[in-house]
Amino acid sequence: MFSFENLGVYQKARILVREVYKLQNKFPTEERYALGGQIRRSITSVTSNIAEGSGRDSNKDKAHFCVIAFESLMEAFSQLQNAQDLGYISINEVENLRPQFEEISKMLSGLKSSFEKKL
């Protein structure tokens, strides 16, 4: 097992990836490759950057990848709101995921801080 697989933030982000994928499947066919593709890229970037950062040698680099993961998380949430504004998903579907986004954002911030304290 790789070290990142033991991180709670990584495990929670994996669950969120699955939930977001389910939502984007509701998009109209023509949007599954445009907005849907962008949402898929941004949400999978969260787990990818957590994993990549864990493989870095320096705590500075590890903290930086937490920032990138956080930015991708915010991007994905914004895109879900756009999809809601366009009528592809409901406000309830977006708001039901908000607690997961908030929890993961706090966990990423805490992980980043823990690496920065070691600098």
Task: List where the protein language model places each region.
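Short, C-terminally biased terminal segments at protein or domain edges
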Residues: 1-119
